[in-house]
Swiss-Prot record:
Zn(2+) 2 binds at C165, C168, C187, C190. It is found in: Cytoplasm. It holds the Pfam family DnaJ. HAMAP family: DnaJ (MF_01152). One of its GO terms (biological process) is protein refolding. Binds 2 Zn(2+) ions per monomer. This is Chaperone protein DnaJ.
């Protein structure tokens, strides 16, 4: 079944900003949340669809890829774990917290709410294993809202100023009665700002901020792993009416490596060796992130044996301890043999038969003796 367009799911335009997307998400998430629609499978599916759309469209990097490539550009990035340390967007408690904040005045103490701090942003950065292990500095481009430099975020045209809202008298809130209860909500006239702009700024049209793509340099420390995140303070969306900006969270996603698999601070790899080296022992070359090194293989090594190379893993970004490289040996069967080579192998195999079999091929002899006992028991 093909997925619906994420913008269509949230009911917003393709140039919608973070605030519009968040507002649409809150409304739809409250409508379809499973706690409010128990037993309704259709509502649960819609909730998942809305949540997925929100997660993609509020991540600057994923949104850019979705805009360019559609669903194919983001399906692989999400994988099975979503956005790891970022969670999956706002949970239901966050939604109710924001909504009740609007109804009851935000601060819950009845005081003025004031301009809202800007929203936090998320950006998923893909790194190679080498970049994650050694650290790297990268430039990223982040679409966001920035304070208008013409009006300094006030929203008012040069030479004019914002006026106190006549409806809420500057508090940003109005009181309404609902039955026996008196509740506060954001003033519908000034939208909670407490100010009215009669002569709006020509650049930002009275918003005090506008959409812009910022280029930022991000320093990734050595030793990070998938799920780690770096906070860039004040690099999120600009706040309303000159309020402080939110933060930008850069989440790390390390791509799969063709040789190594990482588990914590340890690295794992498979090393093919000839059956001669496995039988007689010797030194082989193995790869590390710092180049090739020698590994001593003990005689009579079997496939699956693990060799530990201490200190050849990853240095922890938190403790500074260095992990190990674990090399799993895979004994390679020779292929494309000549007739003379085959004859030599036959002669070698014949030398293992008879009384010498238990000495030279203990696992094979033990296996076949076990099979024989099994069938003897069945027929006895």
């Amino acid at each position: 079944m093909s997925k619906r367009d994420f913008y269509e799911v949230l009911g917003v335009s393709k140039d919608a900003d973070e605030r519009e997307i968040k507002k649409a998400y809150k409304r739809l998430a409250m409508k379809y949340h499973p706690d409010r629609n128990q037993g309704d499978a259709g509502a649960e599916e819609k909730f998942k669809e809305v949540k997925e759309a929100y997660e993609i469209l509020t991540d600057a990097n994923l949104r850019a890829r979705y805009d360019q490539y559609g669903h194919a550009g983001v399906d692989q990035s999400q994988g099975g774990g979503g956005h790891g340390g970022f969670g999956g967007g706002a949970d239901f408690g966050d939604i109710f917290g924001d909504v009740f904040g609007d109804i009851f005045g935000g601060s819950r103490g009845g005081g003025r709410r004031g301009p809202a701090r800007g929203s936090d942003l998320r950006y998923t950065m893909e790194l190679t294993l080498e970049e994650a292990v050694r650290g790297v500095s990268k430039e990223i481009k982040v679409p966001t809202l920035v304070h208008c430099e013409v009006c300094n975020g006030s929203g008012a045209h040069t030479g004019s100023s914002a006026q106190t809202c006549p409806t809420c008298h500057g508090s940003g809130q109005v009181q309404m009665r609902q039955g026996f209860f008196a509740v506060q909500q954001a003033c519908p006239h000034c939208h909670g700002r407490g100010k009215i702009i009669k002569d709006p700024c020509r650049k930002c049209h009275g918003e005090g901020r506008y959409q812009k793509t910022k280029t930022l340099s991000v320093k990734i420390p050595a030793g990070v792993d998938t799920g780690d995140r770096i906070r860039l303070s004040g690099e999120g969306e600009a706040g309303e009416a000159g309020a402080p900006a939110g933060d930008l969270y850069v989440q790390v996603h390390v791509k799969e490596h063709e040789i190594f698999v990482r588990d914590g601070n340890n690295l794992y790899c498979e090393v093919p060796i000839s059956f001669t080296a496995a039988a007689l022992g010797g030194e082989i070359e193995v790869p590390t992130l710092d180049g090739r090194v020698k590994l001593k293989v003990t005689p009579e090594t079997q496939t699956g044996k693990m060799f530990r190379m201490r200190g050849k893993g990853v240095k922890s970004v938190r403790s500074g301890q260095v992990g190990d490289l674990m090399c799993k040996v895979v004994v390679e069967t020779p292929v494309k043999l000549t007739e003379s080579q085959k004859e030599l192998l036959r002669q070698l195999d014949e030398s293992f038969s008879g009384a010498a079999a238990k000495t030279h091929k203990p696992k094979s002899e033990g296996f076949f003796e076990g099979v024989k006992r099994f069938f003897d028991d069945l027929t006895s």
